[in-house]
A protein has these predicted regions:
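Acidic, proline/glycine-rich intrinsically disordered inter-domain spacer in sigma factors
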Residues: 9, 80, 85-109
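Structural recognition of an alpha-helix C-terminal capping motif at a helix-to-coil junction
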Residues: 37-44, 57-69
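Short, charged helix-capping/linker segments at alpha-helix termini
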Residues: 2-13, 23-41, 51-54, 140
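Arg/Lys-rich amphipathic alpha helix in sigma70-family domain 2
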Residues: 48-55, 64-85, 97, 160
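C-terminal flanking helix
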Residues: 23, 43, 112, 116, ...
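DNA-recognition helix of helix-turn-helix
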Residues: 68, 72, 130, 136-162, ...
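A short pre-motif secondary-structure segment
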Residues: 118-122
Length: 168
């Protein structure tokens, strides 16, 4: 009975520490209105499969991997797509910012899926390169290559230039 209480306490601790991160990920990737369900399903799957986890890496990366699979399953079931970026940037801002945001969304959509997901996990979720690799089922080096290639493609697609007009 003591071992079971230990596992329950560990699961509760992980939920407390990582629920907000998992929910944020699910809000971006789950079909509309299903983010909370996806987050709950993520933790349910984690609890069911926790014997396979064995603290091999950071729990957050493992949970994001599960969330990614849950959201993909839900999207297939509902034939939905990713949530769109908001049309306007909160707080107003320069009207050109909206154009920039649309251009960025279009450029991101043209990237291969693995590169797009790597960028979102790294810069949107704040995962390390190693955690990105773990979440996507690739090595740290493959994740770094995917990130580098994605950034290079975005720079070329968006014609990014520095303050002196040189291509970056």
């Amino acid at each position: 009975m003591g071992k079971r209480n230990e596992r329950t306490g560990e699961a509760e601790r992980l939920v407390g520490e990582h629920y907000a991160d998992v929910l944020r990920y699910c809000r971006r990737h789950a079909p509309a209105g299903l983010a909370e369900d996806a987050a709950q399903e993520t933790f349910l799957r984690f609890v069911r499969a926790r014997s396979r986890y064995r603290e091999r890496g950071r729990a957050r990366a493992y949970l994001v991997t599960i969330a990614r699979n849950v959201c993909a399953d839900m999207a297939r079931d509902r034939a939905s797509s990713w949530a769109e970026l908001p049309e306007a940037i909160p707080g107003g801002g320069d009207p050109g910012d909206e154009d920039d945001r649309r251009d960025l969304a279009s450029a991101l959509a043209r990237l291969p899926r693995a590169q797009r997901e790597a960028l979102e996990l790294r810069y949107g979720e704040g995962l390390t390169v190693g955690e990105v690799g773990a979440a996507l089922g690739m090595s740290r080096f493959a994740a770094a290559r995917a990130l580098s290639s994605a950034l290079e493609a975005l720079r070329a697609d968006l014609d990014v230039r520095d303050e002196k007009g040189r291509e970056v």
